[in-house]
Amino acid sequence: MTEMLETVEIETGPNPAWSVVWLHGLGADGHDFEPVVAEFDLPEGVRFVFPHAPVRPVTINGGYPMRAWYDIVSLDRGGPEDEAGISASADQVRRLMEIEADRGTPANRLIIAGFSQGGA
């Protein structure tokens, strides 16, 4: 069973016709891009879903626990990658997309956005 991510949600109007699932970068959280929503001039209702990545130790940061979509084991090109962490995060994001579909957002109106590690 996929663990549900905690989220911050903002709707720009009643009955949103669009959904944006927006992933933050390493060490940030779902509140990171919350202030940006007010800067958009959107013609119709949009639901922004800002999930919080799980807290996990990040190897390149001395194993310090922080919000991360996956562990970063090495910065070397072709170096080892946290395939299990990447897969788990992909499953969690996929679940958020399913929830938005269940709420009535058609696939052609569902946008996935990400910054830094959230966009990788």
Q: For each of these PLM feature ranges, what is it?
A:
Residues 2-111:
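Serine-hydrolase catalytic machinery in alpha/beta-hydrolase-like enzymes
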Residues 113-118:
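Gly/Ala-rich beta-loop-alpha elbow adjacent to hydrolase catalytic centers
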